[in-house]
């Protein structure tokens, strides 16, 4: 920058600050500077202050200078203002050269700093102000947080805690992980990490104890961030646009009021169970998750909300809409369970009584469980509950027949302890497993007295829970959703005892008639439901699920196998955690001892060191359900697993037989479409049956539909008969003929299927009335460029693309002018993620693509050296190999040309860094060196010369030729251009006199030649056609020679015709002061 430019910069900046300096100094406005501007200011300051050192802190005054120097006075004013500025925004625009140091030493009072695109290694002076910053914004600059927080940018110092920083915004960066530098932000309240690439927060957010607002949206998180003590203050959590499948850990954020989980991967509403403990939650967003598409999404979500959220239902927002009270009531009518989600309470926390703990806790915390509802539940559960010989802690008074039960209690104490241990371990439905758990030969004795029915245990509902539906309602949902149903053998005896005991109770209470009617109705439903219970094939096994290849331990549960399903049943509440169909089971096996020893052991279990691990493979589409691994926790684990395998082996054998029959029908032979290699698919590797020995099921990655020769996945199944007659083969080829509705490729309008049939003749003019059998149609929008017929896509993958991993991106059917070729020819321009292809259209598009497409050119994308958008956006020039090769795409429609350019630039930006070049798109400008400059009129009143440019077709009888139409305020030109010529071709020589003198001689040489010209004053009228809306005729009349002439033109879209008429009409009507005559005819007459 010269001295004059530097002084001009100082004057302009000083003038701006003199006018608006008060709002800058008060902090109401932010001072925004480009980094080159700040560098020039620092250079000027250093000329008068000397070298600036990092040790200079505090307010600095300039040395005294003569007061008659205006530059020095402006400089001193600027220096004083910068030292008192409170808010600064630095914007860096990357240039071709290296970036020099960016010093912020003059800013001594900063409280708010924003960095956009600033290279942090060039930033100096942050160490002097970081301890006083209150707001920090850094975007498009960060690779790791420690670059800014620990090293203070280019200062490379060891920062102490940022004591004053309250808000930090690190969005739109390239962060892939967090680091320990976040612990320096001890006072932070607002943190924005959105639009990065973070996959796991680990524990780096646990030190932010004052954090109130956390935005970590649009990252790649798989787990909810761990907050630790910092979660106590968190009120707003935004996790939108991540990859969450589970909300485990969210229950720790008890004060959360705003939660955004939109656009994640939450599949079922049961994943929302942690929301049960978020009593302060008032806003929830689930839009875009798979569960959001459930027809009863709002009602299903309402059952997992905290009771306090139900109390505030009128103010609760779900997906931006107020949650109505009807949403809380709908789940009962729909059969949705209003039961609270399971909580991670340890086994053994259930109280000794079967009825559960004192309900006063639930009443005080939730405020929605009322005593009348409890009585209603008791009346429903009474018939269903087994006989338990102890008082219920939910009764106002113990109801016993013996007024002095002390002796009876001592007599029955051993049996009570045994039953209590069962209930403590297995929950309310402990009778379901009694036959498997009680000692042989010592069945539980029938107690002579009965206790009042009690409420369900707290472990099955959790605090603040709403009452469960009645058992008839629960069983009405079918055996798949009611695993608590007992088998007939186990439940027969308790039912008979219950009838007798209830009868005695009702005689004492005077309710025998009403209770008898209720019992009779419920017993009929019970007998009907028992017939639908699936028979158990073996005893339940106590197991611990292992998740993922690492074997992460889950919660202990029971594994039940029935005639049709395999259930994972919760220990305490006996709820079904997972239901898997046996018909989908493919393999069942025991992992070897070495693999089992490497698997983690659940803490607190007394299992043997050699506990077996059971692996089950299912044929589900969802990856999470394809493999189930269980650590067997039974005392006789090996015997129990063998018993289970004896049941599951016949099921897997049937699955293998069905798979073999299916492969026999397919004859098991494939052919690769890329290399022609024929091969048989590999047999599925199922554990011990594989040729390579045992292999863990979760490591299976083989796919039989991949060619072993070239790795391509484009394979077809060979026909059953190898001797197919030629007649059938021809019929098969004819069956590939496209349907009239097919749209194999997108191309600009008007080009149709007109081909360059003659070697030296130009392509025919566009005709929108004949598109051939491929029904080519223009893309209505940019996304249409990526749409391609499946037959053409297969042809590109097999015959054109040279790499097996090459992927199609977009294509455009367009005329192309290629350097070294005469004229232009129709091409299919295809862009992949590796190369750009030109496929010449050589024939009618009625046969397979190989018969009418010929590969002409393949250019690696990293070799592109120039992209230029032509005049009016009607052409696109591509250069490669430093200009050694070039071509011009001629869509002649600005919309399609710009759409293709945007797609091409997106593909170039997505290339790997090693392949990415620095090519950027430019736009052709008309300068004095331009080929059209001598034809334009110079207007002294305007800076730029006015003209209208259009690539069109000149209709000459039944044929057409390519021309360019150039309009100036006084003249109309028809030009012949060499589209593939160099952009720096010599322009037509300028001469005085008539324009005809400027016409260069024909033949090789200039890139443009004036074919014909007419003064605007000779234009008499314009002729349009209803049947051909892209055609027009300009009629001329020369008053001197009294001759009439016309130009019959054709454009590619009606928008161009409208713009052409609008540009002509204004100067013509200004010249004659009357309206331009426009005549519309019905049909196009080619003979005139």
From Swiss-Prot:
Compositional bias annotation for Acidic residues: 508-529
LRR repeats: 109-130, 132-152, 164-185, 187-209, 210-231, 233-254, 255-276, 280-301
Compositionally biased spans, kind Basic and acidic residues: 750-759
Keyword Electron transport: no
Positions with biased composition (Basic residues): 375-385
Pfam families: LIP1, PH_S11IP
Keyword terms: Cytoplasm, Leucine-rich repeat, Phosphoprotein, Repeat
MF-aspect GO terms: protein kinase binding
InterPro entries (alphabetical): Leu-rich_rpt (IPR001611), LIP1_N (IPR031782), LRR_dom_sf (IPR032675)
Main location: cytoplasm
Biased composition (Low complexity): 346-367, 447-460, 978-994
Any one Gene Ontology cellular component term annotated for this protein: intracellular membrane-bounded organelle
Localisation per UniProt entry: Cytoplasm
Compositionally biased intervals (Polar residues): 733-742
GO biological process, one term: protein localization
Phosphoserine: residues carrying this PTM: 387, 389, 392, 470, 599, 761, 773, 777
Disordered, as annotated region: 335-407, 437-533, 724-780, 978-1009
PANTHER family in the record: NISCHARIN RELATED, SERINE_THREONINE-PROTEIN KINASE 11-INTERACTING PROTEIN
Known role: May regulate STK11/LKB1 function by controlling its subcellular localization.
Subunit and partners: Found in a ternary complex composed of STK11/LKB1, STK11IP and SMAD4. Interacts with STK11/LKB1 and SMAD4.
Record family assignment: Belongs to the STK11IP family.
Protein name: Serine/threonine-protein kinase 11-interacting protein
Species the sequence originates in: Homo sapiens
Gene name for this UniProt entry: STK11IP
């Amino acid at each position: 920058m010269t001295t004059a430019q530097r002084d001009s910069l100082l004057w302009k900046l000083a003038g701006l600050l003199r006018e608006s300096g008060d709002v800058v100094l008060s902090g109401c406005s932010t001072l925004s500077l480009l980094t080159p501007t700040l560098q020039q200011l620092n250079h000027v300051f250093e000329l008068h202050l000397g070298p600036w050192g990092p040790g200079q802190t505090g307010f600095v005054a300039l040395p005294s200078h003569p007061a008659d120097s205006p530059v020095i006075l402006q400089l001193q004013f600027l220096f004083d203002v910068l030292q008192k500025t409170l808010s600064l925004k630095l914007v860096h625009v990357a240039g071709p050269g290296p970036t020099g140091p960016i010093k912020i030493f003059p800013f001594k009072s900063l409280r708010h700093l924003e960095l956009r695109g600033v290279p942090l290694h060039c930033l100096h002076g942050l160490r002097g102000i970081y301890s006083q910053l209150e707001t920090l914004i850094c975007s498009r600059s960060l690779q790791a947080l420690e670059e800014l927080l620990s090293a203070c940018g280019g200062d490379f110092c060891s920062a102490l805690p940022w004591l004053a920083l309250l808000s930090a915004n690190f969005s739109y960066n390239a962060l892939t992980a967090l680091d320990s530098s976040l612990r320096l932000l001890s006072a932070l309240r607002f943190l924005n990490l959105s639009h990065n690439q973070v996959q796991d927060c680990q524990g780096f957010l646990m030190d932010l104890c004052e954090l109130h607002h956390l935005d970590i949206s649009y990252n790649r998180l798989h787990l909810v961030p761990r907050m630790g003590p910092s979660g106590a203050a968190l009120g707003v959590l935004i996790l939108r646009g991540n990859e969450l499948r589970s909300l485990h850990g969210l229950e720790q954020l008890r004060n959360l009021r705003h939660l955004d989980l939109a656009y994640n991967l939450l599949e079922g509403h049961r994943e929302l169970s942690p929301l049960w403990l978020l009593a302060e939650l008032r806003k929830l967003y689930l839009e875009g998750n798979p569960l959001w598409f459930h027809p009863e999404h709002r009602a299903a979500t309402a059952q997992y909300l905290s009771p306090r959220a139900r109390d505030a239902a009128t103010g609760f927002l779900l997906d931006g809409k107020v949650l109505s009270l009807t949403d809380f009531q709908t789940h009962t009518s729909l059969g949705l369970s209003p039961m609270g989600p399971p909580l991670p309470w340890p086994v053994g926390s259930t109280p000794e009584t079967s009825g559960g703990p004192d309900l006063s806790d639930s009443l005080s915390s939730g405020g929605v469980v009322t005593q009348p509802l409890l009585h209603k539940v008791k009346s429903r559960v009474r018939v269903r509950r087994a006989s338990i010989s102890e008082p219920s802690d939910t009764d106002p008074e113990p109801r016993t027949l013996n007024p002095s039960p002390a002796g009876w209690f001592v007599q029955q104490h051993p049996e009570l302890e045994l039953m209590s241990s069962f209930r403590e371990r297995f929950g309310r439905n402990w009778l379901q497993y009694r036959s498997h758990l009680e000692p042989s030969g010592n069945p539980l004795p029938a107690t002579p007295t009965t206790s009042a029915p009690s409420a369900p245990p707290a472990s099955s509902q959790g605090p603040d829970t709403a009452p469960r539906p009645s058992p008839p309602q629960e069983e009405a949902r079918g055996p798949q959703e009611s695993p608590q149903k007992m088998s007939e053998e186990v439940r027969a005896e308790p039912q008979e005892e219950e009838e007798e005991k209830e009868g005695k109770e009702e005689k004492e209470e005077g309710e025998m008639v009403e209770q008898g009617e209720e019992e009779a109705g419920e017993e009929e439903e019970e007998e009907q439901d028992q017939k639908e219970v699936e028979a158990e094939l073996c005893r339940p096994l106590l197991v611990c699920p292992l998740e993922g290849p690492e074997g992460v331990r889950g919660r202990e549960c029971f594994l039940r196998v029935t005639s049709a399903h395999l259930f994972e049943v919760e220990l305490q509440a006996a709820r079904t955690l997972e239901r898997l169909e046996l018909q989908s089971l493919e393999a069942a096996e025991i992992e070897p001892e070495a693999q089992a020893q490497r698997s983690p052991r659940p803490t607190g279990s007394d299992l043997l060191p050699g506990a077996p691990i059971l692996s089950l493979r299912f044929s589900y589409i969802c990856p999470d359900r394809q493999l189930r691994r269980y650590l067997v926790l039974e005392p006789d684990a090996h015997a129990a697993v063998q018993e289970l395998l004896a049941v599951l082996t016949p099921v897997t054998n049937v699955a293998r037989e069905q798979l073999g029959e299916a492969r026999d029908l397919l004859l098991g032979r494939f052919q690769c479409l890329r290399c022609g290699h024929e091969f048989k698919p590999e047999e599925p590797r199922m554990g011990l049956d594989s040729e390579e020995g045992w292999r863990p099921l979760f490591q299976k990655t083989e796919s039989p539909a991949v060619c072993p020769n070239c790795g391509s996945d484009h394979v077809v199944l060979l026909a059953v008969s190898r001797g197919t007659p030629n007649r059938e083969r021809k019929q098969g080829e004819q069956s590939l003929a496209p349907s009239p509705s097919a749209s194999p490729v997108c191309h600009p309008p008007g080009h149709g299927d007109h081909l360059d049939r003659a070697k030296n003749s130009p392509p025919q003019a566009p005709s929108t009335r004949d598109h051939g059998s491929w029904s080519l149609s223009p893309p209505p929008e940019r996304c249409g460029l990526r749409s391609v017929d499946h037959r053409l896509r297969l042809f590109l993958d097999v015959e054109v693309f040279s790499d097996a991993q090459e992927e199609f991106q977009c294509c455009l059917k367009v005329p192309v002018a290629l350097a070294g070729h005469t004229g232009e020819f129709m091409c299919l321009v295809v862009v992949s993620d590796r190369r750009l292809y030109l496929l010449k259209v050589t024939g009618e598009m009625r046969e397979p693509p190989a018969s009418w497409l010929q590969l002409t050119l393949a250019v690696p994308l990293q070799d592109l050296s120039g992209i230029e958008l032509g005049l009016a956006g009607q052409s696109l020039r591509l250069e490669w190999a430093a200009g050694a090769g070039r071509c011009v795409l001629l869509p002649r429609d600005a919309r399609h040309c710009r759409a293709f350019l945007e797609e091409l630039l997106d593909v170039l930006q997505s290339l790997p860094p090693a392949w990415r070049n620095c090519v950027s798109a430019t736009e052709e400008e008309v300068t004095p060196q331009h080929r059209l400059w001598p034809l334009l009129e110079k207007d002294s009143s305007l800076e730029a010369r006015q003209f209208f440019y259009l690539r069109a077709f000149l209709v000459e009888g039944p044929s057409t030729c390519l021309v360019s139409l150039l309009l100036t305020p006084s003249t109309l030109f028809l030009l012949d251009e060499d589209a593939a010529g160099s952009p720096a071709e010599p322009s037509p020589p300028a001469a005085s006199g008539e324009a005809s003198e400027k016409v260069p001689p024909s033949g090789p040489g200039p890139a443009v030649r004036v074919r014909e010209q007419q003064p605007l004053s000779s234009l008499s009228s314009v002729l349009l056609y209803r049947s051909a809306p892209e055609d027009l005729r300009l009629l001329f009349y020369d008053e001197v020679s009294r001759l009439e002439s016309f130009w019959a033109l054709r454009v590619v879209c009606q928008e161009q015709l409208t713009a052409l008429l609008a540009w002509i009409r204004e100067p013509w009507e200004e010249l004659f002061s009357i309206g331009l005559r426009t005549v519309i005819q019905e049909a196009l007459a080619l003979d005139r």
